Amino acid sequence: MCNGEKPKRLRYNQPEEMTMKNHAIRMLLGAILVAMTSASSFATETIKAVVIDGYPARALWVKEFTNFFIPEIDKRLAMSGNYKMDWQESYGGTIVKPKGVLEGIKLGLGDIGIVTTIFHSSKLPSQAIAAATPFVADDARAVAKAVDEIAKEFPTMQAEFEKQNQVYLATGVVLDTYQLFSRNPVNALVDIEGSKVAGAGMNLRYLEGIKGAAGVRGGLTDFYNMVQTGLVDHAMLWPEAAKTFKIAEVAPYMLRANIGAVNSKTITVNKGYWERLPDEVKKALQEVALAYRDHVAGIAMDRAKASRDAYIAAGGTIVDMDPAERTAWANAMPNIAAEWAKKLDDAGQPGTPMLNAYMAKLRNAGFEPVRDWAAENAAN
């Protein structure tokens, strides 16, 4: 500089500098993007589910929906962490009465429901298959499995629910076998003649061969008052329900006729709600519905003896029906199974094949019917 030279400026390689800066920015943005993607991939989607039934929470099938079905769904979904259910349970008439579940699910008042099918014989005729074949099997597990297999092998059952804007998941058999509970001692068919019997759906037809006996339609929650007030002399239900609803207080005599186990519940889902569900949730619902079916049927059988013991402890008396009287009762009825099958046949549905398949399934499971409804139907 003393020589008059101008100071030299330091020159930077600008392209290289910019390249390094851009690379750093890209690295930073990439890290942020990865972090955001990672966070979103672990975000759990919450799905609201409104469950309805008109029966109270203490009813076996409702109680086990809370204690078994819901925790099982939660457990399966937690394995992936993709989805979580926000359960909203509404029972005991909060949204619908016992007879209103089918309509409630159809209209979207609930997303998932436990439909009592015996109240809807005109809309769900194929669901009466077990009720139309009394005195065949008194094992809830065998009947539940057979009915569900029929629903899978024949499209009729699922199609009936589809017409009601809902998807069929699984059947439910919540009783070991129907028995007759009475205000006064009953030992034989003659003791039922000329009396009134509370029942629901198809089982009222069991009385048609008994002279002067009349069925009075009612729901399980109505039976106590119906007997107490003298509206009826007897009620057809099962020991576990008799224990739950304290039937021994008004009907202290049980005739053990072993009329048979009947499918009376079906778990369904509103069709629109179902279509919006992710496949993972659909799969969980389908699998747990079958597990719930077997779980509830198993409890019904496990509790059968304990429920009879509880009935006796509450002041009840149990009388075993003479086998000859039981056979006479079965033979006195019209062939309601054949009538059921013909009605479906006439509507273009496979009523007779369904009846034959159902009876064959129960025979293969080790049950010999008191009356072979399918064989009589074939003979005619």
Language-model features and meaning:
Residues S38-A43:
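Sec/Tat signal peptide C-region and signal peptidase I cleavage site
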Residues M1-T19:
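Short, Lys/Arg-enriched N-terminal segments with co-localized hydrophobic residues
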Residues M18-L29:
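Bacterial N-terminal signal peptides that target proteins for export
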Residues L29-T37:
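Hydrophobic alpha-helical targeting segments used for export or membrane insertion
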Residues Y12, E16-E17, T44-A144, K152-N380:
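N-terminal secretory/targeting leader peptides
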